[in-house]
């Protein structure tokens, strides 16, 4: 459970994320592989498992995220990106499926690092 301070941070992050989406200043990291339903899949195939056929749909779902959907704020472990970046991790029901979403904002845009079926909190 997030603290009041963390919830305020998430609220600010979501406002910034929505502004970046409105400006189309977004990037989905589609080259990654993820574990979904116990199998390794590319990120785009994982979207199909949720019932998402168009990348633009993920941004519509992200715009509807609420503070209470966030369950963790963590640091980026991939030093190639930014070791100081905060990662915001969410769980949301989409198309009757439990979905795990990981987002961050860097100096360029809003990044969606994960958007796939929830594997009990991991990615």
Where in this protein do the model-derived segments appear?
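Compact soluble domain cores
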Residues: 1-84
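Short linear sequence elements within intrinsically disordered, low-complexity coil regions
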Residues: 76, 93-95, 120
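Enriched for short, Lys/Arg-rich terminal
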Residues: 98-100, 104-123
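Basic/aromatic recognition patch in beta-strand/loop cores that engages polyanionic ligands
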Residues: 80-105
